Amino acid sequence: MARVTVEDCIDKVDNRFDLVLLAAHRARMISSGSQLTIDRDNDKNPVVSLREIAEQTVSPEDLKEELVHSLQKFVEVDEPEQDTVPLIGSAGASVDADDTEVALERMTEEELLKGLEGLAPPEEQPEEDE
């Protein structure tokens, strides 16, 4: 990059590193087909972008915003949450409350033994080779 062009831009963009980022982004935009705001004069895209910044035909603030948007891969959209969704802590408490309300049928040992006598053991099946 031509030193004269960088020196011309320093009063428009205070930080040299920011200037390089903005000029490189503008040069990429020019390479991808963006309209030039000044005559090319047989200069390459980085020099043209620096001349555009120096002559204030493009705004450094707009370039910075476009640079940030070009680097974003995911745009987060804030959506309001539904109020009807129960909280995890309150859901656990309601499950415990439901467990205590269930009435279990009590069986005596004799009733259990009678029920087990009626069950037939499963028949053993010979193993078949596949």
UniProtKB/Swiss-Prot annotation:
It catalyses: RNA(n) + a ribonucleoside 5'-triphosphate = RNA(n+1) + diphosphate. One of its GO terms (molecular function) is DNA binding. InterPro entries: DNA-dir_RNA_pol_omega, Pol_omega/Rpo6/RPB6, RPB6/omega-like_sf. Residues 110-130 are annotated as: Disordered. It holds the Pfam family RNA_pol_Rpb6. One of its GO terms (cellular component) is DNA-directed RNA polymerase complex. SMART domains: RNA_pol_Rpb6. Transmembrane segments: none annotated. GO terms for biological process: DNA-templated transcription. Keywords: DNA-directed RNA polymerase, Nucleotidyltransferase, Transcription, Transferase. Its EC number is 2.7.7.6. Promotes RNA polymerase assembly. Latches the N- and C-terminal regions of the beta' subunit thereby facilitating its interaction with the beta and alpha subunits. Belongs to the RNA polymerase subunit omega family. The RNAP catalytic core consists of 2 alpha, 1 beta, 1 beta' and 1 omega subunit. When a sigma factor is associated with the core the holoenzyme is formed, which can initiate transcription. This is DNA-directed RNA polymerase subunit omega.
